[in-house]
């Protein structure tokens, strides 16, 4: 008889279960309290109950745990310095959506060579999240794959659904199940309406299918996530200007949704020129000083060293430099945080 299934797949390995990984890298009571508390602080900012600014900042993607921990240690000092004005959260992205092809992140390919040691990647991701949270720094990530969230979501304080997946029904269902606040990016073309639709969908209850923590395929009912919000990330042109923010708020108001959003300094808003993130920062700071309450948070891409590098077989990587989108360096990061904190002073 002719085979009619699995004609285009080859088995690589068995996947560890979320329970097994969590037993190897368990959450302590102090880390659990830290994650819970940081989520609550973020929720209050998104609801307008806390005038401080949510700042999600860090490397475009994680590829080197040592460099990531050095960055986290320096970021913790900035958290303490600016805690009265900023709620700083570290960007810890382990999955990378691709327009066509490319390295898909630490979880999929931790060795950067196409060997796809996913179990090792999951282990590295969970270990790093534990260490960063133990430092006292909350973590943020994009939820891209429908399964991998089961391995790390208990350590995430703020999540995103990316521009390429905001319109996806299964990602909206996943967002409705997540225990952290979730931001939805506008589409790659700049369309913010799809993000508003995603917020509305994720607030509702859904049925969806997923493996549970022990790997058993399960039918889940979600209760809905009341903390969905737009992330303005630009598109064919930037959308961080005051008129863009006002237009997005008008759409939110139309559907009786909270008129609070997050502005991404990178991606379409910097037109893929990473140093322009500083220009976006200046504009947003002025909007805050002018009395804008709609801007609840910002995102920025920064690392220890400026720019980006290519993965070249047989050649060592430059320590502390991105291998995906170019990032601001640490010195610029400190300047950016200082400017944001000074602008938020006007809210007090």
Curated annotation (Swiss-Prot):
Q: Which domain of life is it from?
A: Bacteria
**SUPFAM superfamilies linked to this entry:** Aldolase (SSF51569)
Q: Which reaction does it catalyse?
A: D-erythrose 4-phosphate + phosphoenolpyruvate + H2O = 7-phospho-2-dehydro-3-deoxy-D-arabino-heptonate + phosphate
Return the EC number: 2.5.1.54
Keyword annotations for this protein, in alphabetical order, are:
Amino-acid biosynthesis, Aromatic amino acid biosynthesis, Transferase
An example of a GO molecular function for this protein is:
3-deoxy-7-phosphoheptulonate synthase activity
Give GO terms for biological process.
amino acid biosynthetic process; aromatic amino acid family biosynthetic process; chorismate biosynthetic process
> What InterPro entries does UniProt report for this protein, alphabetically?
Aldolase_TIM, DAHP1/KDSA, DAHP_synth_1
Q: Which GO terms describe its cellular component?
A: cytoplasm
- Protein family per UniProt: Belongs to the class-I DAHP synthase family.
Q: Report the protein's function.
A: Stereospecific condensation of phosphoenolpyruvate (PEP) and D-erythrose-4-phosphate (E4P) giving rise to 3-deoxy-D-arabino-heptulosonate-7-phosphate (DAHP).
Protein name listed in UniProt: Phospho-2-dehydro-3-deoxyheptonate aldolase, Trp-sensitive
Top-down, what is the taxonomic lineage of the species of origin? Bacteria, Pseudomonadati, Pseudomonadota, Gammaproteobacteria, Enterobacterales
- Gene field: aroH
């Amino acid at each position: 008889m002719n085979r009619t299934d699995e004609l285009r797949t080859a088995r690589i390995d068995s996947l560890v279960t979320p329970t097994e990984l969590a037993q190897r890298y368990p959450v302590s009571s102090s880390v659990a309290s830290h994650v819970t508390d940081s989520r609550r602080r973020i929720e209050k900012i998104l609801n307008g109950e806390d005038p401080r600014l949510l700042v999600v900042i860090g490397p475009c993607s994680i590829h080197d745990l040592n460099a990531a921990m050095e960055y986290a240690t320096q970021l913790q000092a900035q958290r303490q310095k600016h805690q009265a004005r900023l709620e700083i959260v570290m960007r810890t992205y382990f999955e990378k959506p691709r327009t066509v092809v490319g390295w898909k992140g630490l979880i999929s390919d931790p060795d950067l060579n196409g060997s796809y040691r996913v179990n090792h990647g999951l282990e590295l991701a969970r270990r790093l999240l534990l260490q960063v949270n133990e430092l006292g720094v909350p973590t943020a990530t994009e939820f891209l794959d429908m399964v991998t969230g089961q391995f790390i979501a208990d350590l995430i304080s703020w999540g995103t659904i990316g521009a390429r997946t905001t319109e996806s029904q299964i990602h909206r269902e996943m967002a409705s199940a997540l225990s952290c606040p979730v931001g939805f990016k506008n589409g790659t073309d700049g369309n913010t309406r799809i993000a508003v639709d995603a917020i509305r969908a994720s607030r509702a209850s859904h049925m969806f299918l997923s493996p549970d923590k022990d790997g058993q395929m399960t039918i889940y009912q979600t209760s809905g996530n009341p903390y969905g919000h737009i992330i303005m990330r630009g598109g064919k042109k930037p959308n961080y200007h005051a008129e863009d923010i006002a237009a997005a708020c008008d759409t939110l108001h139309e559907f009786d949704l909270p008129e609070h959003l997050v502005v991404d300094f990178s991606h379409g808003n910097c037109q893929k020129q990473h140093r322009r993130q500083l220009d976006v920062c200046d504009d947003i700071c002025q909007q805050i000083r002018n009395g804008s309450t709609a801007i609840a948070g910002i995102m920025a891409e920064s690392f220890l060293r400026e720019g980006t590098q290519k993965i070249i077989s047989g050649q060592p990587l430059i320590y502390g430099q991105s291998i995906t989108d170019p990032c601001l360096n640490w010195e610029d990061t400190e300047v950016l945080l200082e400017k944001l904190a000074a602008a938020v002073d006007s809210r007090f």
